[in-house]
A protein has these predicted regions:
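Amphipathic alpha-helical "recognition" segments
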Residues: 47-75
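N-terminal acidic-hydrophobic amphipathic loop/helix motif that frequently occurs adjacent to catalytic
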Residues: 1-58
Length: 75
């Protein structure tokens, strides 16, 4: 079934559920990043910083890495 075939109500409900799941996953990612930084695990991967690790190993763009690390530091 494609999105085009969904009723408006079903589409909206699925979207809300996905956004909720996305928030939960993002919070888990941020907590994991914080623990990686606390343990300085990025150095095991020849990265000088969490930012370098996020870009090279996690394949985030520089702006994605910066946003996530900034959010992580607010926890």
């Amino acid at each position: 079934m494609t999105l085009k075939n969904l009723t408006d109500d079903v589409l909206i409900e699925r979207l809300k559920k996905l956004v909720h799941e996305e928030r939960e996953i993002l919070m888990s990612v941020l907590h994991h990043l914080r623990e990686v930084e606390r343990r300085r695990l990025f150095s095991k991967y020849q990265c000088a910083s969490l930012f370098a690790y996020a870009v090279t190993e996690l394949k985030y763009s520089e702006s994605q890495a910066d946003r996530r690390i900034s959010a992580m530091r607010l926890l």
